[in-house]
Amino acid sequence: GAVQASANTGYLANAASSVNITLPTVPQIGDWVKVTGLGSGGWNILQNAGQRIGVSGLPGGLAVNWAASPIVGSWTGLASSSAGDRLVAVSASGELYTSANAGGNWSPRLIGQTWSSVASSSDGLKILAAVNGGSLYWSPDGGNSWLNDGTGRAWTAVASSADGNRLVATAYLGQIWTSSDGGLSWTARESNRAWRAVASSSDGRVLVAVTNGAQLYVSTDYGVSWTARANGQFWWSAAVSADGKTMFATVDTGAIWASTDFGTTWEPRTTNRDWRGVATSADGRWVVAATSGGTLSQSTDGGNTWRATADTGAWTAVASTADGSRYIAGKSGAAVYTGQRVLYTTTGATGGVSGGQNDALQLQYVGGGVFMPISYVSANLQFGVR
């Protein structure tokens, strides 16, 4: 059946087939509509022209839509500005690309180096990139001009503070190197280890560096001193929240491990897989991790629960905006993908939300064509979002 909803009215969908309920055509701010599924057919909320529904707080409403970019490479490192407008992608096959419009267009910058990692400041203008067996390269202007340090180390990973001044780089079977002046000078830290990856808090004070086959190490003094944490694993990648309190680290043929106490204690949060890159929002709530030969996985609750996103492939690296609404992810030998988190239904008559038997949803009109959920019961794990 089909019903045109009236404002401030509740509806019981009691049929063997889905009941279509269209939102009020001229709602006033504060008006509400409630739908409860009694029958086995469930319900389907339809929208009018110019209307949409906020779904960020609904089960099933936090999916990420992925789209392939035209650039192809063996992607080893990705970086995103806080807003997601400026992106950097580096490949072991020799490419370094930048984008200034959220991946709409890509510009080749430095070609022919075996790139291993890249990091950027929060505005995306200051870029630090590493070459495995070569130098560290940095750009102050979004990739238009570059300097390098002239070294020839087995650089594996780099990380940057939000302002781009405090930098850290790891060398495989070498040391950890830190800079407090945007890369002009570097100081060797810690011992020679099989360093695999490194991540930084926004101020550069809290750092985590992971090793291939041994423990991971945490610093809370800008990299001056390091403390061994967790246990020996084949660690692959790491990510840190802006304040440094929440950390994630992936293990090759292991789990994703998490810490919520500045890296002091760690616990596994996932099943064992061939985990690769991991990225987190600034607050540590939104997390995306890559697997080699599987899908990307995402968490919307700080790593407590995970579900698949994107398709299957040899995913390698991933980066996130500060708010966790947009992502960039790379497949080895394939494309770079941009991801957009679904925060609203599609505007207009093609969008809407559906539920099943025993599902209930109450929406309130907040203006501008937007209805927001104020209560729900999700008996079927998640709602359908269009």
Can you say where each PLM-predicted feature lies in the sequence?
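Exposed extracellular interaction/assembly regions and N-terminal maturation sites
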Residues: 1-60, 368-386
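Conserved Ser/Thr-centered positions that define the repeating blades of beta-propeller domains
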Residues: 80-81, 98-100, 121, 139-140, ...
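Loop/turn residues immediately N-terminal
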Residues: 93-96, 133-135, 173-175, 213-215, ...
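Blade-level signature of beta-propeller repeat domains, shared across WD40, Kelch, NHL, RCC1
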Residues: 316-341
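Extracellular jelly-roll beta-sandwich "head" domains, especially the C-terminal globular C1q domain
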Residues: 342-386
